[in-house]
A protein has these predicted regions:
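Extracellular glycan-recognition regions
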Residues: 1-187
Length: 187
C-alpha cells in the first residue's frame, strides 16, 4: 500500500472511530477503507469519506470489490459540505443482508434519508455510478462495469463545486471492518 493520488483526500463526517484508508495503484486505483464505528442513518451522519472536489457535471464510478465485518452500507456519495447535514446523494450496497443496491438522498434540514431501491440481490463485486447533469443526479449499477442499469434520479440543489467520493457505514465498534473499492473513474 502506498500514497494515494494527490487529488484525493480522507475526511470524517461526524463521529468516526478508528477510521483509516490505504491505497494501492492497481485495478485502476484501489482504496481500502477501514473503520471501527461510523454509522449513517436517519438524522445521523457519521462516516469516513474518501473524496475529491469536482466542479460541474460529472460521471463517477467504482467497484465495491470486498466487504468484511460489520459494514451496513458502502459505495459512492456526492455532498455539498464536509460537515454533517447538507444535501447529499448516495449510491450504495448494504442493508438487509448486504444485498440491496439503492440510491439515497438527504436534504439539508430533514432528519430523513430517502431511498430508491435498485437490485435487491446485488453481491460483490458490484459496480456503482453517480452522474450529475446540472441539478439532476442519476444513479446506476452494473455487474461488469460495462452494462449499466438505471436505478433512480433526483433533483438536488447543490453548489457547482461539491465533494464526491466513497463512503462506508460501519457498526458495532469491532476491529476488522473494511471495504475495498477499486476501478475508480471520474469523467
Amino acid at each position: 500500500m502506498g500514497e494515494w493520488p494527490q487529488e484525493w483526500a480522507y475526511g470524517e463526517i461526524g463521529d468516526v472511530v478508528g477510521g483509516k484508508v490505504a491505497y494501492a495503484d492497481v485495478q485502476e486505483g484501489t482504496f481500502r477503507l477501514e473503520c471501527r464505528e461510523g454509522f449513517m442513518g436517519n438524522g445521523v451522519e457519521n462516516t469516513p469519506f474518501i473524496y475529491r472536489k469536482i466542479k460541474g457535471d460529472f460521471s463517477f464510478s467504482c467497484r465495491v470489490n470486498a466487504i468484511k465485518g460489520n459494514v451496513s452500507e458502502c459505495g459512492l456519495m456526492a455532498k455539498e459540505t464536509l460537515a454533517g447535514g447538507g444535501n447529499a446523494v448516495t449510491m450504495t450496497l448494504g442493508h438487509f443482508g448486504r444485498r440491496f443496491a439503492r440510491m439515497g438522498w438527504s436534504v439539508k434540514g430533514e432528519k430523513k434519508r430517502h431511498f430508491a431501491i435498485g437490485n435487491t440481490y446485488t453481491w460483490v463485486p458490484a459496480w456503482f455510478k453517480l452522474v450529475r447533469v446540472g441539478r439532476v443526479f442519476y444513479a446506476y449499477e452494473s455487474t461488469d462495469g460495462v452494462n449499466w442499469f438505471y436505478v433512480h434520479s433526483t433533483r438536488m440543489d447543490m453548489p457547482m463545486e461539491i465533494y464526491v467520493g466513497m463512503i462506508g457505514s460501519f457498526r458495532e465498534g469491532k476491529r476488522g471492518n473494511y471495504v475495498v473499492l477499486d476501478h475508480i473513474s471520474i469523467d
